[in-house]
Every structure is written in C-alpha cells, then in structure tokens.
Amino acid sequence: MSKFIIKNLEKTFINDNKNNTLFRDINLEISADKITVILGKSGCGKTTLLRIIAGLEKISSGTVEYLDDEKNKDYKIGLVFQESRLMPWLSVEDNIKIHDTKNKISTSDIDRFLDLVSLKDCKKLFPNALSGGMSNRVAIARALAYNPDILLMDEPFSALDYFTRKNLQQTLIEIFKNTKKGIIFVTHDIDEAITIANDIIVISNGNFKTFTIKDPQPKDIDKLEFLELKKEIKKLLK
C-alpha cells in the first residue's frame, strides 16, 4: 500500500505583515493507491494541501513522506489543474508530447491514452476545436502519458456543466480501474466527492476528518447511507 504520511504539519502565510496559520499540528495519512478526495469550502486550504503533497509548496514545519510496500520513496506525480492549459498552437497529439524531450512517447502510446479518455480520433485537432470537457480529457491524457504513480487533480471539472462533469467522473473511475494509479482529487462538491471517492478528507476550519467508503464507484448518491454521509459532511462544513 502506498501512502503519504503527514506529521506535525504547519503552514503559515504572511499577510499584511502578520502571520496567518492555515494548518497547525496536522497529522494525516493519505492513500496513494485509491481515489482520495480532498473536500472543503473555498479558501480552506485544499489546493495548498495538494501543492504540499506535490512538492510545489513549502511547509512552515513538519514532514511529508511517501511510503510504499517496497520501501521505494521515488515516485512520479501527474498534475491536472482546473484549466486544461493546452497550448493553442499545438495539436492534441503535440500537446500530449509537449514535455517529451527524449521522445519516449510513441504514437501508439498517445492512441492508448486518448482511447482511455474517449478521444482517440481527436489527436490531430487543435484546442479551439475542443469543448471544455474534451480539453480536460486531453489534460488527463497528457498527465497519464508520463506514466505517473499518482495523479493529483485540482478541481479539474468545476467549471464544466453538470452532464460533462458526470461523464468525466465516469472517465476518471474507468482510468483508476484500468491503470490502478492512485488519484488525489480536490473538489468543493459533496456529490462529486461521494460519487468517485474511496476516501474523503474533509477540511473545515483547519481541522481534518477522513471518511472511507467501501461501495465501488460510481456511487448511487441517493442511497440512504450516502444521504446521511452528505448531511454529516454538510455539518462539518458549516
């Protein structure tokens, strides 16, 4: 089992010459081989926590450690942001290869990853021919192309319409089942969290609470147990 172990984490920002503490004395384990959702209101620190896990954000004190069963601490991360960040002058195929300086990604690799996100026939298209949902799928394929151990995703579907989001949630679940890659996914949407997650980490007022869901994805969020879970999470987020 792969996981991130966070010990005694403190994160402080300086604002108007004052120290503002976002996290204090946080101890947490986050699975790196499930779909783990980090859930909370805007400004609660979801993205900051994701950036800390990715090594993009310095911590004020404490430790963040990655462990797996083989005691191998080397790992690769794939990042997917809210904006797809595709280069408009490059085709889908070339966007996926944009960081492939050693030409390790073959045409068959690109076909395979685009097939995973249901875009196999779109590799010659340019971003201006893609919908928002299609652009997000390309961003996911691009992240997968570099064979990461873990995908970190920062509210990648939040700007999309309901139906596109539902389709992409299903795509994400299929990717997890087919590749067995861990996914850490940030959202503020409770329904989305329950639908896709194995674990949900709720952040509220600097406090963390983890819920584990045993049902396979996608969940039927209208089941009584999930309606009760939704109520409990809403109370935490008040």
Model-derived features with residue positions:
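Conserved structural motif at the start of ABC-family nucleotide-binding domains
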Residues: 4, 23-25
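Helix-to-loop junction immediately C-terminal to a conserved catalytic motif
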Residues: 54
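Conserved ABC transporter NBD signature motif
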Residues: 61-73
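Conserved ABC ATPase "signature" region
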Residues: 105-122, 174
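Conserved ABC ATPase signature
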Residues: 126-130, 134
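A short, proline-enriched helix->beta-strand linker immediately N-terminal to the Walker B motif
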Residues: 145-149
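Conserved beta-strand-loop-alpha-helix hinge in the C-terminal portion
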Residues: 206-232
